[in-house]
């Protein structure tokens, strides 16, 4: 739908702007110095290309770095700082056009926002960063759609990324840069998990609702999850 495309284009433009604004910050230069493997994926604002995983991490960190990225007030979560770097690097890595780029953004962004509505505030109250946790799943499903993964492979990708998702909010104690890193890490894990699944690696199908799944592990247990938000109106 046009309104969805218009919103995503706005998020993409905003994300590119804040990436450029943060390009010379210490937390970005330190990541560039650490993640040096060359590849085909752009580091926005820099004359350098790296592999998809590293590009996702660095660009995602830059988008979220100064906290001017978009916000969905469901939990809340920051969609652009995960999805734009994840889909940009993936599209570049496998040489896809702008239409497929937008498709990947739609698929992943939708899942992040829906997961954020399942148990509002519960993840944050448990001590985790919702963008870091839910973002990994959006990134995984978005990248899976670009790779042409089957339904079973997409399901495995989500199960796999459940063991990669992370992000504690202890950065609040000292104001360190791990908060900035969280969306980038989630973006990179989407690339890894989708490719693992495409290659035949299996992940649990009950990653969201299972006894040891996301909402029983990362969410405050006195807030009852409503899983209908994941599939309602589809």
Language model region names:
Residues 1-234:
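N-terminal core-entry segment
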């Amino acid at each position: 739908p046009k309104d969805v495309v218009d919103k995503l284009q706005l998020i993409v433009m905003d994300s590119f702007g804040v990436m450029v604004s943060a390009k010379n910050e210490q937390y970005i230069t330190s990541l560039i110095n650490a993640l040096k493997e060359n590849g085909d994926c752009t580091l926005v604002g820099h004359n350098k290309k790296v592999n998809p995983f590293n590009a996702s991490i660095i660009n995602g960190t830059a988008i979220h770095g100064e906290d001017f990225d978009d916000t969905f007030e469901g939990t809340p979560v920051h969609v652009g700082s995960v999805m734009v770097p994840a889909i940009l690097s993936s599209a570049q890595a496998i040489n896809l056009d702008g239409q497929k780029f937008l498709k990947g953004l739609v698929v992943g962004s939708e899942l992040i926002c829906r997961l954020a509505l399942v148990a509002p505030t519960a993840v944050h109250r448990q001590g985790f960063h919702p963008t870091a946790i839910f973002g990994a799943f959006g990134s995984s499903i978005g990248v899976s759609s670009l790779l042409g993964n089957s339904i079973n492979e997409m399901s495995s990708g989500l199960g796999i990324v459940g063991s990669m998702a992370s992000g504690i909010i202890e950065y609040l104690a000292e104001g360190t840069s791990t908060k900035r890193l969280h969306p980038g890490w989630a973006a990179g894990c989407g690339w890894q998990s989708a490719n693992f699944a495409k290659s035949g690696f299996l992940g649990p199908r009950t990653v969201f609702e299972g006894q040891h799944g996301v909402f029983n592990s990362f969410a405050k247990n006195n807030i009852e999850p409503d899983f209908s938000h994941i599939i309602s109106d589809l």
